[in-house]
């Protein structure tokens, strides 16, 4: 009986040591510790700033850092990529809106807007694997993140927009989340979440289970679409993010969450990236393989 008591006590002590950190956008600052400000349009005032102070958005006492305009080139103040913050409470098709009209806490509350630059990811020589990554202060185990459709992207998926055509039930738009090391290299497994698949679109905040990922120094975010042209993806590559949770210990969420949250598995077969979902295989562009 005493042995059982001491075993349970030791197990409880180990469990109690685990610490979870959830993204808190109210703590967001620049590199110098100054609080992030929003302009009259309810977006981060420094969204188009290439100043070094805004290369990362620091949250949770710098335990979670979001990349912003990592290339340092805003093309004269008219371009941005990576992550920015928004408090927009509308859903009109704007790039800084999400279909939920706000973060997890409700309409008008802050959320993260991501814009993935395929051009930067494929051509940069800065040592970063993507325009969109979240860096941790040390190695953590990812637990979960909430993803929501961008209003601008949903408009394109439904109606077409500029060079982007409307989606059919054969099209897919996927967000690929992968762990990174301290050298910003992608390592280990990936989680693939579909913003559009089988004629269905993300219509609000959905939890994505990240517990299959190993301990890492951060996360990279990439996007793929079946609508591509000579210059790459035609579909607007925006997405919204909130509620990222990381832990000092491995999180076991159970097999029942795999189908609903992970959505798909990424595998490398004969040098080709394949995505497996519901017994089907897709290539990296999201095309169904027979």
Predicted feature residues:
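Positively charged n-region of N-terminal signal peptides that target proteins for export
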Residues: 1-4, 18-19
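Sec-dependent N-terminal signal peptides
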Residues: 4-13
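N-terminal targeting leaders for non-cytosolic proteins
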Residues: 19-130, 137
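Terminal, low-complexity interaction segments
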Residues: 25-27, 172-251
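Extended extracellular/luminal ectodomain segments enriched in beta-structured repeat modules
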Residues: 137-144, 215-216
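Short coil-to-beta strand junction motifs in C2/discoidin
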Residues: 156-175
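Residue-level detector of functionally pivotal "anchor" positions at catalytic/ligand-binding pockets or at interdomain
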Residues: 248-275
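Short, glycine-anchored, charge-dense loop/turn motifs used at functional sites
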Residues: 282-287
């Amino acid at each position: 009986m005493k042995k059982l008591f001491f075993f349970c006590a030791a197990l409880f002590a180990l469990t109690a040591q685990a610490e979870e950190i959830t993204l808190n956008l109210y703590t967001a600052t620049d590199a110098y510790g100054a609080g992030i400000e929003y302009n009259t349009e309810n977006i981060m005032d420094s969204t188009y700033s290439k100043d070094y102070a805004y290369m990362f958005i620091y949250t949770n006492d710098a335990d979670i850092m979001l990349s912003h305009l990592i290339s340092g080139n805003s093309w004269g103040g008219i371009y941005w990529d990576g992550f920015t913050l928004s408090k927009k409470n509308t859903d009109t098709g704007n790039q800084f809106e999400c279909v939920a009209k706000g973060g997890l806490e409700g309409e008008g509350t802050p959320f993260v807007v991501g814009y993935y630059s395929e051009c930067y990811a494929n051509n940069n020589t800065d040592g970063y694997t993507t325009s969109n990554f979240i860096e941790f202060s040390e190695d953590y185990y990812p637990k979960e993140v909430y993803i929501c459709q961008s209003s601008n992207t949903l408009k394109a998926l439904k109606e077409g927009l500029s060079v982007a055509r409307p989606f059919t039930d054969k099209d897919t738009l996927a967000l690929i989340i992968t762990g990174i090391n301290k050298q910003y290299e992608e390592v280990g497994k990936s989680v693939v979440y579909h913003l559009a698949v089988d004629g269905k679109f993300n219509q609000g905040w959905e939890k994505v289970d990240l517990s299959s990922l190993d301990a890492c120094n951060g996360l990279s975010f990439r996007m793929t679409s079946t609508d591509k042209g000579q210059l790459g993806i035609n579909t607007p590559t925006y997405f919204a993010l909130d509620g990222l949770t990381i832990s000092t210990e491995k999180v076991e969420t159970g097999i029942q969450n795999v189908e609903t949250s992970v959505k798909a598995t990424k595998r490398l077969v004969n040098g080709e990236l394949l995505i497996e979902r519901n017994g089907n295989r897709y290539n990296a562009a999201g095309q169904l393989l027979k």
